[in-house]
């Protein structure tokens, strides 16, 4: 729960992004809890364990999604309402609790693939850089990526050229991923929002189908 809350917090850099992706996650989770594992006949047909409290959890999730929809309406760029760190972490907690209620922790990979890809890859990069740093590799970021390079002890172009290729590869990408899309690919905030939502809206049904039918 703490890890997913942190990952969700990393989404809070584009107006409406965290709320919109969470809204998609809640709709799919609510449908799964209420209409699949909360329904005796459907769960039996799909050979899934029936959870008697699944329907109650589904209703709770749909109610939370309705409230979140009102927030997203006012959080569209330019945002009139901000959630801050406390709000984004609460969204992560809400999705995490619903995933645990489903009885399958791996459901988080199904309902929030873009959320995990956006923030999780940044955590992986950080861990890898710390690991390589402990092994003695120069893992300083390149000076071209930092405004005040000396204050951040960044690597010059000559020092960057001497760094290991995997360190240079890691520094080539900015994280969270939405920041890379904005700074490196020159996507606007609305482009990031729509494209991230589209990817999650396409991936989640596909992964859900693999989970319930082809597992």
What does each model-identified segment do?
Residues 2-4, 16-215:
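Alpha-helical transmembrane segments
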